[in-house]
């Protein structure tokens, strides 16, 4: 091992050496980035540093200069991190700005007055979200997520592809100074001066959602608050987290947190002052088991010779200016470098091979620790790390993401070739025939093989047609329609059908390759397979009532009885694009599922939001940090502020809701009248100026009726389904749920007026074609009529309907015209609503 320190390997400018706060090595191990008090990010060549450390003669003096020096920050650079895919470099500063850098492959001349730089890095994104210094940055192992933490107590999650802000957590009560990702891509952990470490679990099925898995307090109860950073590290096998600035009694230590149980049974004790940083070596090592005696028996030596186990190595450093290397097989450090720097150590970084360790300090020095081959142990291949992570459901392919446009083009080209190959192979035989009749089909296919004929040969009678005539199940063609005689599956013939194979002989005598018409295999063999009397959808009976459309469903249920007229009509409704056929329904949007959905925001609307099919403008409040509701007149004005504690993506996480409940604040005439906390996510709200109450609907189907002074007027109402819009009229409250049901209550009398009135009869009253449900209209608005205590609905197609409770149905409201003819009077009398509703 060698400890190397170069005088030029620092942030030196105008006879001053600046403190260095951060260091990181690129995934390919060729570059190392540093940042410090001078506000610059410097990129150095690792190969040049290794060559200089080896003392090679003839080394160019230009190698003593950084490859690039970027100065876009207006404050000190506190953290830099390369993305695991190597495409980006993220940097954070005390100017509260997060910059995303990318290397420009084009050659650019150096600016006036600057030294010639070998690389040019440009800012691709400038992200502003923190309210104070950014202290640490970490990327997900697949580069899909970026997390930043800072002195504003916030944890901000960014999209690693487009760098949009996904979520902001303000769960810590003090400065957040460290963050690290799980190598298995399941968790990330943060360390804060509130003397806690929080483990966040994230799910990437569809929309990314986050939950707080565990809050760890015990190792940090007496943790000092004097460190600049709390840079923690996760072991490469995913089993342990090393957290600096912990305590074990009165002694400073580094806590080792076990995965899953999240307890701390191991502490690394040895530093005289609080530690700032801990870094696991990215490689796992094999080491021989120590022999107890030097003169042991040969049998014992043979047994222990091949007995190897995996070990991980961790480096710790901090304010005592010392560096310690620990290994999992020993209780004491294997190496300690005292006073390796003159001031506190701020950051460390291993290269991907695990044989070089970079250490930065406040004395503006950068120290390199270079280890010889197998000095730390025998490193296992990098694939061995993935094998260790398999226990957590991780494989190498789970980290594969499109890295560039060229990769997407190559994948598209491969997919096109694959389709062509499948199309050419499908002309020989069908996969279903092979599965049903493997032996008989092999015999028959030999007789159906078609080879190119000579120009002198004639095409007369084909063998498959003769076989077809010999079949017991004859195909009878009558009036241009085909019929298949019903046959039991036990007595079905074994000859393969060739009705879909057409061969055309050209004038030159050559035979064109048979063209296999692309049909549904189930249609072809439906005569042989038993089917239920009522067609059951492939996705289940529940899809019949949910209105879920499945492409090709009609063709599946019509069976094999398809004639030329049906084929012509089907072909007229098909549009060919890139070799595939799409029906008229394929060009429309998919149907909406009538199920509860966890996303109810206007800005994140998806096709499976059921309420969108019913109502044009919903009453769902926005998924923002604070929503303001207003009610009343100018003289008597009321406001209600709603602060949901969690986002809609985790609205059903009870633990997160109890940790961060929804806060409700009410104001009247400049005074706060309401302050309440509800462990539910509020999605809709409305106020009544007459009865002076607020109606708040939650994501789990509850409705809270609270007065303007915060009292709960009636027990909360449980509908079991989300409310998408509320309307207040006098003392009455009318709501529409996501399943299209109306409910109405008289809040003053505390009784129900309307319940379970479905909107579907007037929405889905158009003729249904086949098995598809098509909704082309929605509700423009609805209102409550106080005189008759009923509901009136106005659709977007300028038609209005009224609910008649005594009839138990809807009635369309016709416009009244002046009576001129007797026939018109008769028509109006027949179509109008009964006399007691004539006021409408």
Swiss-Prot record:
GO biological processes: negative regulation of chromatin organization; negative regulation of transcription by RNA polymerase II; negative regulation of transcription by RNA polymerase III; nucleosome assembly; transcription elongation by RNA polymerase II
Keyword annotations of the record: Chromatin regulator, Nucleus, Repeat, Repressor, Transcription, Transcription regulation, WD repeat
Any one GO CC term of the record: chromosome, centromeric region
Superkingdom field: Eukaryota
Localisation per UniProt entry: Nucleus
InterPro entries xrefs: CAF1B_HIR1_beta-prop, HIR1-like, HIRA-like_C, HIRA_B_motif, WD40/YVTN_repeat-like_dom_sf, WD40_repeat_dom_sf, WD40_rpt
Residue ranges of WD repeats: 15-54, 72-111, 129-168, 171-210, 224-267, 292-336, 340-381
Any GO MF annotation of the entry: identical protein binding
PROSITE patterns registered for this protein in UniProt: WD_REPEATS_1, WD_REPEATS_2, WD_REPEATS_REGION
Family recorded in the similarity comment: Belongs to the WD repeat HIR1 family.
Function: Required for replication-independent chromatin assembly and for the periodic repression of histone gene transcription during the cell cycle.
Annotated protein name in UniProt: Protein HIR1
Organism in which the protein naturally occurs: Candida glabrata (strain ATCC 2001 / BCRC 20586 / JCM 3761 / NBRC 0622 / NRRL Y-65 / CBS 138)
């Amino acid at each position: 091992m060698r400890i190397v320190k170069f005088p030029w390997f620092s942030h030196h400018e105008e006879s001053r050496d600046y403190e260095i706060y951060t260091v990181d090595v690129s995934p390919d191990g060729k570059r190392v980035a540093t940042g410090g008090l001078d506000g610059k990010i410097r990129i150095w060549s690792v190969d040049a540093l290794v060559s200089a450390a080896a003392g090679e003669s003839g080394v160019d003096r230009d190698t003593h200069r950084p490859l690039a020096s970027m100065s876009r920050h207006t404050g000190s650079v506190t953290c830099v991190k390369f993305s695991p895919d190597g495409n980006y470099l993220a940097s954070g500063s005390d100017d509260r700005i997060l910059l995303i850098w990318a290397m420009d492959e084009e050659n650019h001349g150096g600016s006036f007055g600057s030294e010639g730089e070998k690389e040019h890095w440009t800012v691709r994104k400038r992200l502003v979200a923190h309210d104070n210094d950014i202290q640490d940055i970490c990327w997900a192992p697949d580069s899909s997520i970026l997390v930043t933490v800072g002195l504003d107590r916030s944890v901000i999650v960014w999209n690693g592809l487009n760098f949009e802000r996904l979520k902001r957590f303000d769960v810590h009560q003090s400065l957040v100074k460290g963050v690290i990702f799980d190598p298995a891509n399941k968790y990330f952990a943060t360390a804060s001066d509130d003397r806690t470490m929080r483990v966040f679990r994230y799910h990437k099925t569809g929309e990314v959602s986050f939950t707080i898995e565990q809050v760890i307090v015990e190792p940090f109860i007496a943790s000092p608050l004097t460190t600049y950073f709390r840079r923690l590290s996760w072991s490469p096998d995913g089993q342990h987290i090393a957290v600096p600035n912990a305590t074990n009694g009165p002694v400073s230590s580094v806590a080792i947190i076990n995965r899953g149980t999240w307890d701390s049974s191991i502490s690394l004790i040895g530093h005289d002052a609080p530690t700032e940083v801990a870094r696991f070596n990215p490689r796992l090592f094999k080491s021989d088991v120590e022999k107890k005696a030097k003169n042991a028996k040969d049998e014992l030596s043979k047994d222990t010779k091949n007995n190897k186990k995996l070990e991980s190595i961790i480096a710790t450093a901090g304010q005592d200016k010392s560096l310690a290397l620990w290994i999992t097989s020993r209780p004491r450090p294997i190496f300690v470098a005292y006073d390796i720097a003159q001031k506190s150590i701020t950051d460390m970084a291993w290269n991907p091979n695990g044989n070089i360790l970079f250490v930065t300090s406040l004395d503006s020095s950068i120290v390199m620790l270079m280890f010889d081959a197998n000095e730390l142990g025998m490193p296992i291949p990098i694939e061995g790390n993935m094998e260790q992570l398999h226990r957590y459901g991780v494989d190498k392919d789970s980290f594969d993401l499109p890295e560039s446009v060229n990769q997407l083009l190559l994948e598209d080209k491969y997919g096109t070739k694959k389709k062509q190959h499948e199309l050419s192979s499908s002309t020989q035989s069908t996969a279903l025939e092979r599965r049903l009749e493997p032996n008989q089909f092999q015999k028959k296919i030999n007789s159906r093989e078609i080879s190119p004929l000579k120009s002198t040969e004639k095409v007369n009678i084909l063998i498959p047609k003769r076989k077809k005539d010999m079949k017991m199940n004859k195909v009878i063609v009558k009036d241009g329609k085909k019929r298949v005689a019903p046959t039991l599956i036990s007595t079905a013939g074994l000859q393969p059908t060739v009705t879909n194979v057409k061969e055309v002989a050209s004038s030159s005598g050559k035979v064109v390759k048979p063209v296999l018409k692309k049909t549904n295999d189930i249609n072809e063999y439906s005569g042989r397979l038993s089917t239920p009397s009522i067609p059951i959808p492939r996705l289940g009976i529940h899809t019949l009532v949910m209105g879920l459309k499945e492409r090709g469903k009609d063709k599946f249920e019509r069976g094999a009885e398809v004639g030329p007229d049906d084929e012509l009509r089907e072909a007229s409704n098909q549009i060919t694009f890139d070799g595939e056929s799409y029906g008229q329904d394929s060009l429309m949007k998919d149907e909406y599922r009538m199920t509860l959905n966890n996303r109810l925001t206007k800005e994140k609307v998806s096709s499976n939001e059921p309420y969108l099919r019913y109502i044009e403008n919903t009453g769902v409040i926005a998924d923002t940090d604070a929503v303001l509701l207003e009610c009343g007149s100018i003289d008597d004005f009321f406001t209600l502020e709603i602060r949901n504690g969690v986002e809609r993506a985790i609205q059903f996480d009870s633990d997160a809701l109890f940790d961060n409940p929804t806060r409700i604040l009410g104001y009247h005439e400049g005074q706060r009248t309401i302050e309440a906390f509800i462990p539910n996510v509020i999605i809709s709200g409305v106020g009544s100026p007459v009865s002076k109450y607020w109606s708040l609907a939650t994501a789990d189907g509850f409705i809270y009726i609270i007065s303007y002074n915060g009292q709960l007027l009636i027990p909360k109402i449980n509908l079991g389904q989300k409310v998408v819009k509320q309307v207040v009229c006098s003392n009455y409250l009318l709501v529409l749920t996501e399943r299209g049901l109306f409910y109405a209550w008289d809040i003053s009398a505390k009784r129900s007026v309307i319940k379970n009135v479905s909107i579907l009869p007037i929405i889905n009253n158009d003729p249904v074609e086949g098995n598809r449900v098509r909704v082309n209209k929605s509700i423009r608005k609805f209102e409550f009529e106080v005189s008759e205590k009923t509901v009136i609905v106005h659709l977007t197609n300028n038609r209005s309907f009224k609910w008649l409770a005594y009839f138990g149905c809807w009635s369309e409201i016709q416009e009244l015209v002046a009576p001129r003819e007797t026939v018109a009077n008769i028509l109006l009398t027949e179509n109008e609503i009964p006399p007691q509703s004539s006021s409408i």
